[in-house]
UniProtKB/Swiss-Prot annotation:
It is an enzyme of class 5 (isomerase). PPIases accelerate the folding of proteins. It catalyzes the cis-trans isomerization of proline imidic peptide bonds in oligopeptides. Binds to ligand-free TGF beta type I receptor, from which it is released upon a ligand-induced, type II receptor mediated phosphorylation of the type I receptor. Binding is inhibitory to the signaling pathways of the TGF beta family ligands. This is Peptidyl-prolyl cis-trans isomerase Fkbp12. Pfam families: FKBP_C (PF00254). It comes from the Eukaryota. Its EC number is 5.2.1.8. Residues 1-21 are annotated as: Disordered. Belongs to the FKBP-type PPIase family. FKBP1 subfamily. The gene is Fkbp12.
Length: 108
């Protein structure tokens, strides 16, 4: 399946991140059963990463690149675009489809 992007709120419609650019996002990650496993919002600290550098799961590299600044969307990531058969011990079971509520705050 890869990553499915489901819009929640529109962005500026013109500023999309490109490979090599640093992005700042707020996110909440949930498992299929709705269990929240991580949230930058809960920490009140946005998360930064560079698009296309493999710093995050593939679903984020490809999904966040489809968002414009200010946009909020659900990124539904199949296991091969998330943590795969390994999962993330103690947090994410193996072969989990993950849903992230992501808001793109800034592109640098």
């Amino acid at each position: 399946m890869g990553v499915q992007v489901v819009p929640i709120a529109p962005g500026d419609g013109s500023t999309y991140p490109k490979n090599g650019q640093k992005v700042t996002v707020h996110y909440t990650g949930t498992l299929d059963d709705g269990t929240k496993f991580d949230s930058s919002r809960d920490r009140n600290k946005p998360f930064k990463f560079t698009i296309g550098k493999g710093e995050v799961i593939r679903g984020w590299d490809e999904g966040v690149a489809q968002l414009s600044v200010g946009q909020r969307a659900k990124l539904i990531c199949s296991p091969d675009y998330a943590y795969g058969s390994r999962g993330h011990p103690g947090v994410i079971p193996p072969n989990s489809t993950l849903t992230f509520d992501v808001e793109l705050l800034k592109v640098e």
